[in-house]
Amino acid sequence: MGKGASNKKVLERVPITKPPFEYNDLKKAVPPHCFSRPLFRSFYFLLHDIIVTCILFYVASNYIPMLPGFLSYIVWPVYWISQGVFLGRLWMIGHECGHHSFSNYRWVDDSVGFLIHTATLTPYFSFKYSHRNHHAHTNSMEYDEVHIPKRKSEALDLYFEFLGNNPMGLMITMLCKLTFGYAAYIMFNYTGKKHKSGGLASHFYPQSPLFNDSERNHVLFSDVGICIVLYACYRIVMVTGAMSAFYVYGIPWVIMSAILFAATYLQHTHPSIPHYDTTEWNWLRGALSTIDRDLGFFNMNKTHYHVIHHLFPVIPEYHAQEATEAIKPILGQYYKYDGTPFLKALWREMKDCIYVESDQGQKKQGIYWFKNKI
């Protein structure tokens, strides 16, 4: 009974009334040192993850192929998951650089972020610019940049009838999204907003409607970096063979992509948090319509403490927990945390959060909640 009551509480909707606090109240509650981002400490975490990643690459390239067949079947998956997690950790540091939360020097942040994201086949400046728009319009039905839910009218099609509303269909959907979702977002803006101006909404296309004129040269620069890495991958394949390169880098990259897609999906998808159209949305409402999760396998505070990240993206991940604890008493019911295990939460959200619509009889029709009844 206790567990059922706890689950019910987790799914209780957050209040939609005006919060009894202001943004400045939250900022004053955060200890000032949480906004500091010392260069030495940030580089310590960066070098730690780079060293572990390099060691894993070295072991996978030189020792795992020498193992007996039966043993390699066990060790390879352990390597893939471990390396995928550490590539994801490096990617998150690059993401921090885009928020200027790595150091006090923007040129350092952009240099480090560019190198890290390029190595993980992410166009740094392109993602930085589109992600900035996500933070500026979080949970806006019209203007958010990623994981925009479908309205009920859009969900009434064959895809949702046959894939989204039965266990086998949900499993196929989940596997496809985890495998291809991140790459599809970067290449084709999958789950992103529809741009009225038309054009290819790709992070690789400088003329994409995702960017303004002042950003296009940086997008092109990001593309050049990606091309260099792809050429390096090609040269490695020529030396080691396609299968070896796929085992050592390709599969861990897919694992990293799955982690990133799942983490961001879960941070913005939950039965208890609303989305808003232009009649109801404001920045604070959007920032509070995110949810903290316990994605322990990822071991990165930006994945655990996402609410504080949207309120104060300049806070580095190693201060996120302390800053969160400082504002929780002020947030009260406006703060949402769900400790449901990762795979269970992912399955539940994909099953229960198929589309959004306003409640019948609801006075404010610009507030949308996740539902699953087709």
Swiss-Prot record:
GO biological process: alpha-linolenic acid metabolic process; unsaturated fatty acid biosynthetic process
UniProt keyword terms in alphabetical order: Endoplasmic reticulum, Fatty acid biosynthesis, Fatty acid metabolism, Lipid biosynthesis, Lipid metabolism, Membrane, Microsome, Oxidoreductase, Transmembrane, Transmembrane helix
Membrane topology, from the record: Multi-pass membrane protein
EC code: 1.14.19.14
Biological or metabolic pathway of the protein: Lipid metabolism; polyunsaturated fatty acid biosynthesis
GO molecular function: oxidoreductase activity, acting on paired donors, with oxidation of a pair of donors resulting in the reduction of molecular oxygen to two molecules of water
InterPro entries, alphabetized: FA_desaturase_dom (IPR005804), Fatty_acid_desaturase (IPR012171)
Keyword Disulfide bond applies: no
Top-level taxon of origin: Eukaryota
Tissue note: Expressed exclusively in the developing seeds. Not detected in leaves or flower buds.
Localization per Swiss-Prot or TrEMBL: Microsome membrane
Annotated transmembrane regions: 50-70, 74-94, 168-188, 219-239, 246-266
Motif stretch (Histidine box-1): 95-99
Position of sequence motif Histidine box-3: 306-310
Ranges spanned by the short sequence motif Histidine box-2, renumbered to the chain: 131-135
Primary location class: membrane
Gene Ontology CC, one term: endoplasmic reticulum
Signal peptide (residue range): none
Catalysed reaction, written as an equation: a (9Z,12Z)-octadecadienoyl-containing glycerolipid + AH2 + O2 = a (8E,10E,12Z)-octadecatrienoyl-containing glycerolipid + A + 2 H2O
Known function: Fatty acid conjugase converting 18:2(9Z, 12Z) to calendic acid 18:3(8E, 10E, 12Z). Converts alpha-linolenic acid (18:3(9Z, 12Z, 15Z)) into 18:4(8E, 10E, 12Z, 15Z). Also has weak activity on the mono-unsaturates 16:1(9Z) and 18:1(9Z) producing two conjugated double bonds at delta(8) and delta(10) position.
Family assignment from sequence similarity: Belongs to the fatty acid desaturase type 1 family.
Domain notes: The histidine box domains may contain the active site and/or be involved in metal ion binding.
Designated name of the protein: Fatty acid conjugase FAC2 A
Gene: FAC2A
